[in-house]
């Protein structure tokens, strides 16, 4: 599938609205950040995060025509937005879900994130925030470049084990402390775990 068609299908699932605030992790040279900026319009905002300084400079130049988009040369995994985001789009494969992303989600916010193994294969999950609940929906299978800062060997091994036990489509919710992992746990990370049980809240 053409990558532009693939990303268009993912952006459709986010159901972005005019005026919304989006954080784009792994912006590269800014192509998809520009599309996000066009979708949210002049009243919206896109914060494009890129860890590579050279790519961040190119993205700034390429996004000059979209004043609602700004580029930050930073590690998107550790970045704290400081204000809630309506949508967070992660453009590289991770083995870990950053607690900072979850903390940055506004009420009814959405997080689109690819969990991938050592071979860069995995799936995009669409995580929503509904009060204290985080319903999760499978969005797409993927093969995508790894996210610098969003992976470690131990988490990669845990993810590989989870993928061998059950399909991504079994995941129904994300849970956070003080709720402890139980027998519905698909994968656990620091400050979060994925469950095959439905969330107490609306569907994502």
Segments predicted by a language model, with ranges:
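Solvent-exposed, flexible loop/coil residues
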Residues: 4-5, 83, 148-149
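Intrinsically disordered, low-complexity regions enriched in small/polar residues
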Residues: 8-9, 34, 68, 81, ...
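Conserved nucleotide-cofactor-binding alpha/beta core module
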Residues: 11, 15-112, 117-121
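A glycine-rich, Thr/Ser-enriched phosphate-binding loop motif common to dinucleotide/cofactor-binding enzymes
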Residues: 1-12
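SAM/dcSAM-binding transferase cores
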Residues: 119-204
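Acidic, low-complexity intrinsically disordered regions
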Residues: 3, 62, 97, 182, ...
């Amino acid at each position: 599938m053409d990558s532009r068609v693939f990303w268009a299908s993912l952006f459709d699932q986010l159901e972005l609205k005019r005026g919304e605030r989006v954080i784009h992790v792994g912006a590269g040279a800014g192509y998809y950040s520009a599309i996000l900026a066009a979708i949210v319009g002049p009243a919206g905002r896109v914060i494009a995060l890129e860890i590579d300084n050279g790519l961040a400079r190119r993205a700034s130049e390429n996004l000059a025509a979209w004043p609602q988009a700004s580029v930050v040369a930073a590690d998107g995994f550790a970045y704290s937005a400081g204000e809630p985001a309506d949508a967070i789009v992660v453009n590289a494969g991770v083995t870990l879900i950053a607690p900072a992303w979850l903390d940055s989600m506004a009420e009814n916010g959405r997080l689109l994130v690819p969990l991938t193994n050592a071979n860069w294969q995995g799936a995009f999950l669409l995580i929503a925030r509904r009060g204290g609940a985080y319903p999760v929906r499978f969005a797409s299978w993927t093969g995508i470049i790894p996210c610098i800062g969003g992976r470690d060997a131990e988490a990669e091994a845990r993810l590989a084990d989870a993928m061998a036990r059950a399909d991504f489509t079994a995941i129904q919710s994300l849970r956070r402390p003080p709720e402890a992992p139980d027998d519905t746990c698909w994968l656990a990370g620091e400050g979060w775990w994925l469950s095959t049980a439905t969330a107490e809240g609306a569907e994502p």
